[in-house]
Amino acid sequence: IAQTPPPYQPGMGDLMVTIVQPRHLKLGLAGQARNWDYADYAQHELEEALETVEKHIPKWRNLDIGQLMAATVKQPLEEVEKAVKAKNAVAFDAAYRQVTEACNACHRSANLPAIVIKVPDASAFPNQEFRVTRP
């Protein structure tokens, strides 16, 4: 009798490239387009993605992921949320750069300085419009 394989357990890299990095990218693109409604959605989705990582991988390479995220990305994400709610482009750009740098600080803390995240300059989603449009 064939045994059912164990359920798939994504690793840290899997979660980062499949749920966190795309959310970071979409938030950046929405903010650059000043699409505040979508940026609000994307910001919350990025927070949820980070919470998913923390839930599924609370410890990684002797690092407490929750503590590391709280120390690096929590405050910048709060600043992004404030900027989006205020529809403040200058504040958004600054806060988003802080989130991006927080991602890189987290990578350095995990001894992975080669993983460098940047403010997007292109979309990986050619089938999605980030500018404000109404049907």
Describe the predicted segments one by one:
Residues P5-P135:
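Sequence context surrounding c-type heme c attachment/ligation sites in exported
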